[in-house]
């Protein structure tokens, strides 16, 4: 699944 690496950046 996708996860957020940063406040506005999802990997």
Curated annotation (Swiss-Prot):
Gene Ontology cellular component list: extracellular region
Main localization (coarse): secreted
Domain of life, source organism: Eukaryota
Disulfide bonds: 4-10, 5-11
Membrane-crossing segments per the record: none
Localization in the cell: Secreted
Keyword terms, alphabetized: Bromination, Disulfide bond, Secreted, Toxin
Tissues in which the UniProt entry reports expression: Expressed by the venom duct.
GO molecular function: toxin activity
Modified sites of kind 6'-bromotryptophan: 3
Entry remark concerning the domains of this protein: The cysteine framework is V (CC-CC).
Family classification: Belongs to the conotoxin T superfamily.
Entry protein name: Conotoxin Mo1274
Species for this entry: Conus monile (Necklace cone)
